[in-house]
Curated annotation (Swiss-Prot):
FAD binds at residues 14-19. Belongs to the MnmG family. Keywords: Cytoplasm, FAD, Flavoprotein, NAD, tRNA processing. This is tRNA uridine 5-carboxymethylaminomethyl modification enzyme MnmG. Homodimer. Heterotetramer of two MnmE and two MnmG subunits. NAD(+) binds at residues 273-287. Signal peptide: none annotated. Pfam families: GIDA, GIDA_C_1st, SAM_GIDA_C. It comes from the Bacteria. It is found in: Cytoplasm. Transmembrane segments: none annotated. SMART domains: GIDA_assoc_3 (SM01228).
Amino acid sequence: MGYEAGQYDVIVIGAGHAGVEAALASARQGAKTLVLTINLDMVAFMPCNPSVGGPAKGIVVREIDALGGEMARNIDKTHIQMRMLNTGKGPAVRALRAQADKFQYQHEMKHTLEKTPNLTLLQGIAERLIIEDGECRGVITQTGAEYKAKTVVLTTGTYLRGRIILGDLSYSSGPNNQQPSIKLSEHLEELGFDLVRFKTGTPPRVSSDSIDYSKTEIQPGDPVPRAFSYETVEYITDQLPCWLTYTSPETHEIIDSNLHRSPMYSGMIKGTGPRYCPSIEDKVVRFNDKPRHQIFLEPEGRNTQEVYVQGLSTSLPEDVQQRMLATIPGLEKVQMMRAGYAIEYDAIVPTQLWPTLETKKIPNLYTAGQINGTSGYEEAAGQGIMAGINAGRKALGKEEVILSRSDAYIGVLIDDLVTKGTNEPYRLLTSRAEYRLLLRHDNADLRLTEIGHDIGLISDERYEAFEKKKAAIEAEKKRLWSVIIKPSPENQEYIRSLGGSELKDGVRGTDLMKRPEMNYETVTKLAPADSPVPQDVAEQVEIQVKYEGYIEKSLQQVEKLKKMENKKIPDRIDYDAIKGIATEARQKLKEVRPLSVAQASRISGVNPADISILLVYLEQGRIAKVAE
């Protein structure tokens, strides 16, 4: 027998990286929020790599922070090592990456949820949604408890009909042998959602005491203090190193001779795996000309012996994994503590979502994270905060928020999912962003803090500090533009010492900074400020001045895009009434139901000729008929 158990504004099902951000975003806006999860000991658990950030992903973490989310603050408090990647390249591809103490990370995040007003945590298994008049109105648990809500967010990760595969062993399970969610997946199919089967994998964990580190290369963290959050002022200094080693020809020989026992090659695994995180079996087969592959040994925390063997994701049988490990330098006598495995799970086809992450089929139902076909904690968290913002705003009767492709990597991620869909676990890459010079690690606050403040996730105090920073950047740019650096003997000698050509006349500080050999530090030695300039302000001044021309070109492209984004398409347009559009384009337009001409132009299978016909009809107002 069912029973009424409670009434909420928002219910979030699942408390992984998407779920915690969704719940916090909802509750911090003032929406009464319930988090329902299978196991409260697994809040924000890291079932795969113990790290946060990296190319594109690290920028997403900064964006989450600029919007008022939690991932950045949490990793700043719980990391064991932090490094800035791609420092030798331009600012568009620089990214921060942290090794996490995975246990401290989840405990700290759970504590944050527990002390957040308007937020209730509950252990339980959601089996069905409450659907009234075609709209989602709550959830029913395994025990028959009925929780009503104005909106519901599904953040189920890899739990939907999860199945672990290890050699010829296969059993129903969520990640790390957690209980899977079977009935909810079946219920989504009953409701008419199209589901796909995806797969991911994880490598073995080994005991640190059994590693011979003398045969590996140390990988220390950066000596310079780093942080993801713009609010962090206290930095962890006692960092732990990671270690680099390599597979050997013997490793590859063992893999080759046991491919018949690999679930990937025997046909046992049906789900599609992530292209950018292949298993070691896949790497050895696809790149058989490579004599070795990198293996990083990453501690899983400060108070555990477990070490994550990055680069050795596998579902080969346990005995093969043990033999494989023993052929890797430094791991000859290693003790395997946990075997690697593959996990298959259900995901929904993401073109069934609006850009708000609300489902088209069932109003008031939102989805975020791996259920939408993505891979990675950061991609999940980025979707989670947007789903939580929008579910909360809809429940409170406010207008929902959509980030564009020029606003944030989160905008690129969501637009790719809902417009193009994905036939494999989606990973965010810098190459997916057209405006990556605008979407940098260093300027996430300048792009998104105002939005976060308007939503109510950024405090007035933090917003005032942000406004002061913006003003300081403009003031310093103005000062350097107005100051003239003269060709005095001392100045000429200094410029020559940097490898630059002498000045012919006096030059503005900003113009001098655009020279390849000059930067903010060198220019301000010739034209020092009256008082010290904060490092983050100096960094912005240098990037905005040195890359001014490129940034201006990108901004012009964004303006063109905005014109197309502003050409809205009526929600109930009848594409069958538009003559001349190709059959494939018509089918795709009907499936995706784009909100604007710009979004329509990004749909796979919709060509410029189809867009031209659509524009003519829209501009002439010839579409009077709409689909019933």
